[in-house]
Amino acid sequence: MSEEMVYFSGLSDALRITFVQMMILSAIAIVIFLYGMIITLQKWGSGATGYALEPQEGKRGSAITFLKTWWKQVTEKSPHGHGKPILEILILDILFQRRILKRSGLRWVMHILIFAGWMTLFALSGLMFSVELTHMIGIELPFTPHMFREWLSIPNYIFGYILLIGVLIAIVRRLFVSEVREASIMYDWVLIGVVFLVTISGFLADGIRTGLIWDFGLDPSLAPPAALFHSVISLLFCIAFIPYSKYIHIIAIPLALLANKGGE
C-alpha cells in the first residue's frame, strides 16, 4: 500500500492504521447509526413524539410508513394556510436557523458556529474519503491523497476553531446564564463535553504531529495514538451515537420543519 494510503492514526508510529482498516471502523459506525435510525423511525411511525419516549402501547411502527407519511405532509398543501415554500424553509429555517435568531442572538451565533463547524468538517472528511477511494481503485487524479490532505489542512483548522468557539459559547451560557443553567441537566453537560472532547482531541492530535500551537511539548511519538483516539471518538459520537441521544435533534428538527411547512 502506498504511503499516501496510511493514516496518521495508529497504536504507534510503526503500527499505523490503513485505509481498509479505517473503512472497517467507519462501516461499523455507519451500521450502528443506520440501525439506530431505523429504530427511531419505527418509534416515530408508531406514535412516539419525542426523544426517549416509547411508542403507543400495542402499536408496531414502520420506518417506511413513517417516511411515506412524512413525505406526504411535505408535498401536500398546508391546511392551516401558513405553509412556506420548501426552498425557503431549507435555506432560512434549517440552514440559517432564523427561528433561533428571533429568540436569542447569542444562542443563534452559538448554533450557527456549531452547525457550520460540525457539518463542514464532516463534508471535508467526506471529500478526503472520496479522493482516497478514487486513488485506491486506480483512477488517476492530478494530485495524490497526501497533497489533497495538505490542501484541506487550512479549512480543517478554520472550521475546527469555528466549532470550538461555538462549543465554548454553549459552555459559557450554561455556566453564567441563569435560565439556561437552571434548565440544564447532567445529560446536557455530557453532550456538550463530548463535542468539546472531539474538537480538542483533533487539535491536539494535529499539534503533536506537526509541533505547531497545540503540541504542548508532548512527545511526537504520541501523535499516532492521539490521532487514533480522535478518529475513534469522532466516528463513535459524531455518527454512531446520533440516533441514541439528543443529537437526533439535528435530524428531527429539519424533518419537523419541512413536514409543518415551517409552522410551529
Curated annotation (Swiss-Prot):
Keywords: Cell membrane, Heme, Iron, Membrane, Metal-binding, Methanogenesis, Oxidoreductase, Transmembrane, Transmembrane helix. It is found in: Cell membrane. Binds 2 heme b (iron(II)-protoporphyrin IX) groups per subunit. Its cofactor is heme b. Signal peptide: none annotated. GO terms for biological process: methanogenesis. Pathway: Cofactor metabolism; coenzyme M-coenzyme B heterodisulfide reduction; coenzyme B and coenzyme M from coenzyme M-coenzyme B heterodisulfide: step 1/1. Belongs to the HdrE family. Methanophenazine seems to mediate electron transfer from F(420)H(2) dehydrogenase to the dihydromethanophenazine:CoB--CoM heterodisulfide reductase. Part of a complex that catalyzes the reversible reduction of CoM-S-S-CoB to the thiol-coenzymes H-S-CoM (coenzyme M) and H-S-CoB (coenzyme B). HdrE may be responsible for anchoring the complex to the membrane. Electrons probably transfer from phenazine to the high potential 4Fe cluster in HdrD subunit, then to the low potential heme in HdrE subunit and finally to CoM-S-S-CoB. This is Dihydromethanophenazine:CoB--CoM heterodisulfide reductase subunit E.
